[in-house]
Regions:
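Bacterial Sec-dependent N-terminal signal peptides
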Residues: 1-31, 440
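Small/polar, glycine/serine/threonine/aspartate-rich low-complexity segments that form flexible
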Residues: 23-28, 73-102, 229-239, 272, ...
């Protein structure tokens, strides 16, 4: 019994670990959970945060350049005199010093650099927001594709079940001679085709799950199971804000637009820094030092005191002719400033194109959804009536299969319109700086 107890404990422990692993593997992910996880773990987002931290260090360095520098130095040397005429063939020399330096004036270049680095820090923070928005768009697209594919699998399974029931009934009718073998073969072929569509839809779903899993940087052993909601119709048919209001809001909240504005400010500071090259620079230096020699008549302590020296210097540099370096720097800074204006304008136009496309997609998809839902209603009614008439011998096999395929196609059209609408609405939410919609 004593030997069995440790074995039982180990078995219970392993069983608990397996259960925990299974629960983790079977975790379902809502859209918001996917977004929250990606914001913390996606590599591109993390790299953009590292770039922001690196820029903060550059700002600290730019600020430190305003303060004096201080350097302590010492040199120890040994000299050998091989000539026999020298009494002491060896000489030891030591020097010691402390030097300080400070730039007093450089045309305001140092302070301008501090301002530019602060602007760059703001731009880096906005770049992080851009990365977050980019991964959000990618995840929303992949998630909606997963939901669409999951619903497509469900519809294909339902269609295959109906085809199987028709095939089974036709088999009985074949035994009684109510239908021909050709009609039965057509229904059998339709059932096989519907089974094949289940496999295709399942493969498509697995592919979309893999894409979503890769966006979240999940481990190979972790499974991606999106939570399939019962989408509320009011979320699909929700009223859209006016297009011009969406664009005006996007201009205020989208990080790339604000980054473009700061890019202009940074370019202006770059031009100011380049113009500083035409101004004189003044720097101050100061040092103290001493030293000693071993073959001197004085003791080392006396030498250090007697050799003690102080130095103060003021350096003035006046640029007279710099081989056009300063003029070239200013002209290139002007060109860069013009480029920054063009980049800002380009970002605004790109945002307008993307926003208008998403808005048009949302409007069109909502109209398609209403139309497809109406079509599905009558296609279902037609299919049900055709099925009843087939049972009593009024409709033939071709008419039954045609009605079934039309109903299945109508269901797929409803799905496409529904999830295209939800995707477009989510994109409009991003352009307005809104959180993800609650589609559950």
């Amino acid at each position: 019994m004593k030997r069995l107890l440790p074995i039982l404990l180990c078995s219970l422990l392993l069983s608990g670990l397996r259960n925990a692993t299974a629960q983790e593997a079977s975790k379902t992910w809502t859209l918001q959970e996917c977004l929250d996880y990606a914001y913390q773990n996606n590599i591109q987002v993390r790299q953009s945060r590292n770039n922001q931290l690196s820029g903060i260090e550059d700002t600290k360095q730019a600020k430190a350049a305003l303060f004096p520098s201080l350097v302590a130095s010492t040199t120890q040397s040994y000299t050998n005199y091989p000539s026999s005429e020298v009494t002491d063939n060896n000489s030891y020399t030591g020097t010691y010093g402390i030097t300080a330096g400070m730039t007093i004036f450089e045309g305001g270049k140092l302070r301008t650099e501090v301002k530019r680095q602060k602007v760059q820090n703001q731009m880096d923070a906005l770049s992080v927001e851009e990365s977050v928005n980019d991964i959000r768009i990618a995840i929303v697209q992949a998630y909606m594709q997963c939901l669409y594919a999951a619903d497509a699998v469900r519809i294909n399974r339902s269609t295959a079940e109906a085809s199987k029931a028709q095939r089974d009934r036709a088999e009985e009718m074949l035994r009684t001679g109510s239908i021909s073998r050709v009609d039965f073969a057509q229904l059998q072929s339709q059932y096989s085709s519907d089974e094949y569509q289940i496999v295709v839809a399942g493969s498509t779903l697995d592919n979309y799950k893999l894409q979503l899993k890769q966006l979240l940087e999940l481990d190979i052993m972790e499974e991606m199971n999106p939570a399939v909601p019962g989408v509320k119709e009011e979320n699909v048919l929700k009223a859209l804000p006016p297009k011009n209001e969406v664009y005006e809001t996007a201009l205020k909240v989208m990080p790339q637009i604000r980054r473009g504005e700061l890019g202009i400010e940074a370019a202006k500071l770059e031009e100011k820094s380049a113009r500083a090259g035409f101004f004189p620079s003044i720097s101050l230096s100061a040092s103290v030092g001493t030293g000693h020699m071993s073959n001197n008549d004085f003791e080392s302590g006396s030498q250090i005191w007697n050799r003690f020296n102080e130095n103060v210097g003021l350096t003035l540099n006046i640029p007279i002719f710099s081989n056009r370096k300063n003029r070239t720097a200013v002209n290139k800074a002007k060109i860069a400033l013009n480029d920054s204006y063009l980049e800002w304008t380009s970002l605004q136009k790109e945002l307008l194109r993307n926003m208008e496309s998403a808005y048009l997609d949302a409007v069109s998809a909502q109209a398609q959804y209403l139309s497809a839902r109406e079509k599905e209603k009558y296609a279902r009614e037609s299919y049900e009536l055709t099925s009843e008439q087939f049972r009593v011998g009024v409709k033939n096999t071709v008419e039954l299969i045609t009605a079934q395929n039309e109903y299945s196609a109508a269901q797929q059209q409803v799905l496409q319109a529904k999830y295209l609408t939800l995707l477009s609405i989510e994109l409009l939410n991003i352009y307005q700086g809104l959180p993800a919609s609650d589609i559950y």
